[in-house]
C-alpha cells in the first residue's frame, strides 16, 4: 500500500543554509580509550567522559565509550588522578552512522563557537536546548530595557550534517534576557519574585561565568562564615579572588549549589558577587508586581509581543546572519540561501466521540457524548467558601455530557471550607473516609493564594486512591474554561472523551507506548509510560523507575512494555502484532535492546522512534503577497522525510496568530524497525491531534508522549512514588 502516492506534495523552506561538504581530513579523528581506576557508577560514565574532554587541551568529543579529537593530545594531558587515555590510532568517521554524524556535528559546533567568540562585541553561550546563543553585549545589543532588566538581540545558531556529509548552518532569532543587577539588588527590589538560577558576576580561571542553582538568602555576614576546608572566612576567600572591600562588607550570605551536581551540597556565596539568571517568567512576574509603575508594565508587555516574531521575520534575519558567518568564518563570499525541500501534507486525524460519531475537536463531545465512560460518582470540595453548589458552568457541562451518554451522575458528595480539617492526621482521614464511600475523583475549588497546600492535598488524596481536579474560583468560569475543567475531571475519572479512527494500513502499530523521564536534580524519574491502542483507546500509565542517570534501564523498559502487552491481551484477546515505542528525547545506547530481543522471540514486530522538541529548526512556505516573496509557517501536518538519516521533521501545531509568533516543528528519528517513514509520520501526527483533556487545542507532542511527559513531571513533584500504588492506572492524574 503506497501511502506517498496519496499524499499532497508541498515545498518547504527551512532556516538552514548550506556551508560545505566535509572533506576527508574533516572526517578523520584521533581516537582514545579511557581507563578509569574505579569503574563509574551506572549513569555516570558519559558525564565523566564529557568532563575529561575539557581537560585535554584540544577540542575533544565523546563517541560511545571513547573520546575523539581532531589533533593529537599532548602526552602530559593523557592522564588524570583517576583516569588514563590510551591512543587507539586514527578513526575514519562516516556521516551515514548516527553516532559518527553526531560527533562530527559537535566538532563543527565547537569550531564555530571558537570563531564566534573572537569578537569583543559579542558573547557566545551554549543553548539549553542545544546549539549556541550568540548575542550582542553592551548598549548596542539592547532592544528593550527597564528597571533592572534588559533584552538583548541575538541569534540561536547550530550546525547540522546530512548523511551525505553536507554541513548546514541553522539560524534563528533569539532574545537574551539579562539583568545587570546583583542578587542583593534584585531581592531588595523584588523580594517576592523567586530565583531559580544565578551566576557569578566575575570571571573564573577559564574566563567564564559559573552558573549555580539558587538555594536561599540569609542574614549571615561573610566574615562569620568559616570555610573549614580552606582555613579562612568567606570574606577572606572572596577578597583573595578579587572582590572589593565594599562588595564583601555590603553582602549577605546566600547559598547556592552547582547545577551539574545531582547531590551537591549548598555552598556559601555573596549576594553582591552573584547576578540572577533572568527568565521570561521572572519578567512576567515583575509586570504583575503591584509596586511596578504602569509605564514599566507596558514596556514589559511590549517585550513579550516583540519577541514573538513571524516566520517571515525569522528567515529574513537568519539569511543576513548566515551570509555574515559564511564570509567571516568560512571564507565563502556567495550569499546564503535558505534550504528548500520537497515535503508532504499529511491528512488530518478523524476524531470519534460516543458511538463512533465523528467530531472536529474534543469540545464537540458536549453535544455528542464521550467515547468511553468511566466513574459516575464525583466529589466536590469547595475550599474557597462554604457554598455547596458546583460552579454553574461546570455543573451544566457535566450534566450535558452525561445526558448525551444516556446516564446519570452522582454529584451529591460535597464538602466545603468549614468541613476541611486543619490537622494533618484528620486531613488524611478526611480523604480515606471519602474513598471508602466510593468517591475516587474530586473537583477541588481553591484560590491560588489559599493557605492550603495544593500539593499536600493532591498527595493525601492519591494516598486514599482519589484523583483531584483543581479549579480557581475567580474569575468565574465561562463555558470554555468550564469545558476544560470538566474534561480534566472526566479524564481523571477514567473517561475517554475521544478516540481515533485507526489508520487503514496493514503495517500500522496496534500498541503505541510513550516513555519520558523527569528529574529533581538528584534522581531521575524514568520509564514513566503511557499507552494507547491504534484507535487512541487508553491503556493507562505505568509507574516509573527511579534511576541515577537519564538513560533508561533496559529491564525497567521491558517490565513496563510487558505489563502493557498483558493489558492489550485482556482487551483484545490476542497479542499485538506490532509495537511503536516513542522516546521523548535522545535514545541512549542499549536502552531498548532487551525489549527488542524479547519481542523478537514472540515474533512481535517493533519500531523505536525518538521524538525531539529541538533540532528541527523552523519550517516555512514561500508565497507572494502584493507581488513580494514572503514566508509563512508551513501548514499543520507538513512533513519532510529524510530516509538517508532515517528521520523526518513535521509541523504538529500552529501559532495563535498568523502574524505573531512561529511554530516549532518536531524532529523524529527512526532508531529501530522496518516500518516506512511515511507511515510512522502519519501515525505520529494523528496522535498529536488526540488531546482528550483540551476542548480546542491539539498537542505538539504525540498524546502518549504528552501524557508520559506530564506524568514524569507529576511523579517528580509527588516525590513519594509509593503513594501511586493506591490509584488506578486508568485515571489520568497528570492532565
From Swiss-Prot:
Stored InterPro entries: Ago_PAZ, Piwi, RNaseH-like_sf, RNaseH_sf
Cofactor annotation remark: Cleavage is more efficient in Mn(2+), has weak cleavage activity with Mg(2+). Cleavage probaby requires 2 divalent metal cations.
Pfam families: PAZ_3 (PF18309), Piwi (PF02171)
SUPFAM superfamilies: Ribonuclease H-like
Positions of the UniProt region annotated as Linker L1: 95-180
Keyword annotations from UniProtKB, A to Z: DNA-binding, Endonuclease, Hydrolase, Manganese, Metal-binding, Nuclease
GO molecular function: DNA binding; DNA endonuclease activity; metal ion binding
Region (Mid domain): 370-498
Changes seen on gene knockout: No visible phenotype during growth under continuous high light (250 umol photons m(-2) sec(-1)).
List of residues binding Mn(2+) 2: 516, 709
Entry comment, domain topic: Has 4 domains (N-terminal, PAZ, Mid and PIWI). The N-terminal and PAZ domains are joined by linker L1, the PAZ and Mid domains are joined by linker L2. The domains assemble in 2 lobes; the PAZ lobe consists of the N-terminal, L1, PAZ and L2 domains, while the PIWI lobe has the Mid and PIWI domains. The PIWI domain assumes an RNase H fold and has the catalytic residues. gDNA lies between the 2 lobes, with its unpaired 5'-end anchored in the Mid lobe.
Oligomer and partners: Copurifies with SSB proteins Synpcc7942_0079 and Synpcc7942_0301 as well as other proteins.
Name of the protein in its database record: Protein argonaute
Family: Belongs to the argonaute family. Long pAgo subfamily.
Amino acid at each position: 500500500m503506497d501511502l506517498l502516492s496519496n499524499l499532497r506534495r508541498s515545498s518547504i523552506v527551512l532556516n538552514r543554509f548550506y556551508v560545505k561538504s566535509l572533506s576527508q581530513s574533516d572526517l578523520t579523528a584521533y581516537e582514545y580509550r579511557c581507563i578509569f581506576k574505579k569503574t563509574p557508577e551506572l549513569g555516570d560514565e558519559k558525564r565523566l567522559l564529557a568532563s575529561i574532554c575539557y581537560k585535554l587541551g584540544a577540542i575533544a568529543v565523546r563517541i560511545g565509550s571513547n573520546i575523539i579529537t581532531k589533533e593529537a593530545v599532548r602526552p602530559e594531558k593523557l592522564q588524570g588522578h583517576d583516569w588514563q587515555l590510551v591512543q587507539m590510532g586514527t578513526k575514519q568517521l562516516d556521516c551515514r552512522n548516527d553516532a559518527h554524524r553526531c560527533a562530527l556535528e559537535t566538532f563543527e559546533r565547537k569550531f564555530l563557537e571558537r570563531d564566534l567568540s573572537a569578537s569583543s562585541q559579542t558573547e557566545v553561550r551554549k543553548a539549553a536546548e542545544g546549539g549556541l546563543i550568540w548575542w550582542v553585549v553592551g548598549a548596542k545589543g539592547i532592544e528593550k530595557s527597564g528597571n533592572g532588566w534588559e533584552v538583548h538581540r541575538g541569534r540561536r545558531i547550530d550546525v547540522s550534517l546530512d548523511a551525505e556529509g553536507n554541513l548546514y548552518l541553522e539560524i534563528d532569532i533569539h532574545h537574551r534576557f539579562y539583568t545587570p543587577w546583583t542578587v542583593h539588588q534584585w531581592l531588595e527590589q523584588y523580594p517576592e519574585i523567586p530565583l531559580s538560577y544565578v551566576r557569578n558576576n566575575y570571571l573564573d580561571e577559564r574566563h567564564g561565568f559559573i552558573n549555580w542553582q539558587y538555594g536561599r538568602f540569609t542574614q549571615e555576614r561573610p566574615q562569620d562564615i568559616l570555610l573549614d576546608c580552606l582555613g579562612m572566612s568567606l570574606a577572606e576567600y572572596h577578597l583573595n579572588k578579587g572582590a572589593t572591600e565594599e562588595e564583601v562588607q555590603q553582602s549577605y550570605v546566600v547559598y547556592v549549589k552547582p547545577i551539574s551536581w545531582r547531590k551537591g551540597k549548598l555552598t556559601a556565596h555573596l549576594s553582591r558577587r552573584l547576578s540572577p539568571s533572568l527568565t521570561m517568567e521572572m519578567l512576567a512576574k515583575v509586570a504583575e508586581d503591584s509596586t511596578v509603575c504602569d509605564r514599566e508594565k507596558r514596556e514589559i508587555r511590549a517585550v513579550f509581543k516583540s519577541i514573538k516574531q513571524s516566520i517571515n521575520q525569522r528567515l529574513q534575519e537568519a539569511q543576513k546572519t548566515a551570509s555574515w558567518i559564511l564570509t567571516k568564518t568560512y571564507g565563502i563570499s556567495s550569499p546564503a540561501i535558505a534550504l528548500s525541500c520537497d515535503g508532504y501534507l499529511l491528512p488530518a486525524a478523524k476524531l470519534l466521540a460516543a458511538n463512533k460519531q465523528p467530531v472536529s475537536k474534543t469540545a464537540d463531545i458536549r453535544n455528542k457524548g464521550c467515547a468511553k465512560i468511566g466513574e459516575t460518582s464525583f466529589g466536590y470540595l469547595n475550599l474557597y467558601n462554604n457554598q455547596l453548589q458546583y460552579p454553574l458552568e461546570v455543573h451544566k457541562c457535566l450534566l450535558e455530557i452525561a445526558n448525551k451518554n444516556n446516564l446519570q451522575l452522582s454529584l451529591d458528595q460535597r464538602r466545603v471550607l468549614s468541613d476541611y480539617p486543619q490537622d494533618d492526621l484528620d486531613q488524611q482521614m478526611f480523604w480515606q473516609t471519602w474513598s471508602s464511600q466510593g468517591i475516587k475523583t474530586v473537583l477541588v475549588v481553591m484560590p491560588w493564594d489559599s493557605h492550603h497546600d495544593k500539593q499536600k492535598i493532591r498527595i493525601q488524596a492519591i494516598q486514599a486512591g482519589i484523583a483531584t481536579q483543581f479549579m480557581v474560583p475567580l474569575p468565574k468560569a465561562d463555558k470554555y474554561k468550564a469545558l476544560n475543567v470538566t474534561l480534566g475531571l472526566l479524564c481523571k475519572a477514567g473517561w475517554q472523551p475521544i478516540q481515533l479512527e485507526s489508520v487503514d494500513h496493514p503495517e500500522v502499530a496496534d500498541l503505541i507506548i510513550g516513555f519520558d523521564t523527569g528529574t529533581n536534580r538528584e534522581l531521575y524519574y524514568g520509564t514513566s509510560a503511557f499507552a494507547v491502542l491504534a484507535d487512541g483507546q487508553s491503556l493507562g500509565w505505568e509507574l516509573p523507575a527511579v534511576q541515577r542517570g537519564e538513560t533508561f534501564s533496559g529491564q525497567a523498559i521491558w517490565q513496563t512494555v510487558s505489563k502493557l502487552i498483558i493489558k492489550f491481551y485482556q482487551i483484545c484477546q490476542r497479542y499485538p502484532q506490532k509495537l511503536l515505542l516513542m522516546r521523548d528525547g535522545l535514545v541512549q545506547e542499549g536502552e531498548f535492546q532487551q525489549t527488542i530481543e524479547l519481542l523478537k522471540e514472540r515474533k512481535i514486530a517493533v519500531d523505536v522512534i525518538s521524538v525531539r522538541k529541538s533540532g528541527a529548526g523552523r519550517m516555512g512556505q514561500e508565497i507572494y503577497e502584493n507581488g513580494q516573496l514572503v514566508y509563512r509557517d508551513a501548514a499543520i501536518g507538513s512533513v519532510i522525510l529524510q530516509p538517508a538519516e532515517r528521520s523526518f521533521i513535521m509541523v504538529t501545531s500552529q501559532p495563535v496568530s498568523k502574524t505573531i509568533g512561529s511554530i516549532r516543528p518536531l524532529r523524529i528519528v527512526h532508531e529501530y524497525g522496518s516500518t516506512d517513514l511515511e507511515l510512522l509520520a502519519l501515525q505520529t501526527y494523528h496522535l498529536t491531534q488526540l488531546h482528550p483533556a483540551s476542548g480546542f487545542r491539539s498537542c505538539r507532542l504525540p498524546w502518549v508522549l504528552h501524557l508520559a511527559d506530564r506524568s514524569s513531571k507529576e511523579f517528580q513533584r509527588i516525590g513519594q512514588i509509593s503513594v501511586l500504588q493506591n490509584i488506578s492506572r486508568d485515571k489520568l492524574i497528570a492532565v
